[in-house]
């Protein structure tokens, strides 16, 4: 997808913009920027951590790209080596990986933007709706992996997000697309 590098920069700017408007409740931000519409919600542990759903008209608004970000105040000298790597995470206890898309300096630390992938929008929103309905949470924890110690890079490696309003928020974002 040739729109992703440009979008990553826009996401980065957007996440930094949202920092002053962070809420711990389930307040969704739904907007459009050029050819991409999005729905973003703040985390409950750190409100500056965001969960984002991006929809591009290049895909005829049929796919959603899911991202999340973590703010860290750890400042290891080699943090940039994480860029484009797949780091181990747990999503509600299930182990998988997430790709580091961007590492941005922020205040006294860094904002790390991850991707969970791109999915068919209708099926994925239904999957998340059902998943959240059973689990009653959407929790991501960054965990240790081969040659990766989470404590070196993340002071708070866990967050969760409320998704009660996921479906209507994605519907609104899709209409903007």
Listing of model-derived features with the role each one plays in the protein:
Residues 1-24:
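Classical Sec-dependent N-terminal signal peptides that target proteins to the secretory pathway
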Residues 23-177:
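A generic "folded-domain core" signal
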């Amino acid at each position: 997808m040739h729109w992703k590098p440009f979008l990553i920069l826009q996401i980065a700017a957007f996440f930094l913009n949202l920092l002053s408007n962070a809420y711990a409740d389930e307040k969704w931000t739904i907007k459009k920027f050029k050819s991409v519409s999005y729905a973003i919600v703040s985390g409950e542990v750190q409100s500056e951590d965001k969960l984002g759903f991006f929809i591009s008209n290049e895909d005829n608004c049929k796919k959603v790209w899911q991202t999340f970000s973590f703010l860290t105040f750890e400042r290891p000298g080699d943090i940039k080596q994480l860029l484009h790597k797949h780091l181990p995470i747990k999503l509600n206890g299930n182990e998988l990986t997430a790709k580091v898309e961007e590492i941005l300096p922020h205040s006294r630390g860094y904002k790390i933007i991850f991707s969970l992938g791109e999915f068919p929008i209708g099926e994925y929103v239904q999957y998340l709706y059902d998943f959240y309905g059973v689990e009653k949470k959407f929790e991501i924890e960054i965990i240790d992996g081969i040659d990766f110690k989470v404590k070196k890079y993340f002071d708070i490696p866990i967050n969760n997000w409320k998704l009660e309003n996921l479906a209507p928020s994605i519907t609104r974002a899709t209409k903007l697309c």
